[in-house]
Amino acid sequence: MNYWDTACVLKLYTAEPDSATYLTLAGQAAEPLLASEILATELTYALYQKELRGALKTGSVERVLKQFQADCDAGRWLLLPLGRDVAIRAAQVATACYQRRPPIAVRTLDGVHLATALLAKATHLVTTDERMRQAARALGMTLTP
């Protein structure tokens, strides 16, 4: 199963230059797409930021969020809970990344996503974030694309 980072999920719901690649990848999935339940919150913030920058038509946020919720309700997404196990694993991710030489400056929410993906035993991580990709490689994860 593919675990999806928020930036790549955004490409599924808003037009970006490389959206077609991610729509194809999501469309090929035989099982639900994996993400942390924090995705819904991050997606909301990201959509409003796009709207403020003029990259999303004013008033579109609610429509996009309704579509995302409909996809969740239809079983397209499996949103994994943020529990103590994720917090513990995220701290381990931080230790593994920051103690490397050179260190990988993974951000907090990226660490939460990496921890969630590891706990879910996701087969691939879908992300475009270079720091997150470096951390994932260091943790032995397979990247897509």
Regions found by a protein language model. Name each.
Residues 133:
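Short alpha-helix immediately C-terminal to the canonical SAM-binding loop
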Residues 38-97:
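Active-site-proximal, substrate-binding regions of enzyme catalytic domains
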Residues 1-64, 130, 139-144:
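Short, well-structured N-terminal submotif of metal-dependent ribonuclease cores
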Residues 77-130:
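Active-site neighborhoods of divalent-metal-dependent phosphate/nucleic-acid chemistry enzymes
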